[in-house]
Amino acid sequence: MAGQKIRIRLKAYDHEAIDASARKIVETVTRTGARVVGPVPLPTEKNVYCVIRSPHKYKDSREHFEMRTHKRLIDILEPTPKTVDALMRIDLPASVDVNIQ
């Protein structure tokens, strides 16, 4: 697997969960002997939803809700078969979306 690279993208609404998951992945990969670049924080995506507070009228009274999606990028350089096996066995929270390329 020399010369190859594994790119892991993490997405989550909770920044503490994504940071803990990234830390766990980096620790696991460094234990197996591969080189790690990251975690690199990518721009946070912010979605704002505007809702009228009243069910009937009073359009001037509105409430804003926002959803922030935090993203991290981890590159694993020169992965070994032991690294890939360790990544498959790692246990991450369900709130973190993992995309491996």
UniProtKB/Swiss-Prot annotation:
Family annotation (SUPFAM superfamilies): Ribosomal protein S10
The keyword Ribosomal protein is assigned to this record: yes
Signal found in the keyword field: no
Record GO biological process: translation
GO CC terms of this entry: ribonucleoprotein complex; ribosome
Top-level lineage group: Bacteria
GO MF annotations in UniProt: structural constituent of ribosome; tRNA binding
Gene3D superfamilies listed in its UniProt record: Ribosomal protein S10 domain (3.30.70.600)
Keywords from the named record: Ribonucleoprotein, Ribosomal protein
Subunit structure: Part of the 30S ribosomal subunit.
Role this protein plays: Involved in the binding of tRNA to the ribosomes.
PANTHER family in the record: 30S RIBOSOMAL PROTEIN S10 FAMILY MEMBER
HAMAP family: Ribosomal_uS10
Entry's family note: Belongs to the universal ribosomal protein uS10 family.
This protein's name: Small ribosomal subunit protein uS10
Underlying gene: rpsJ
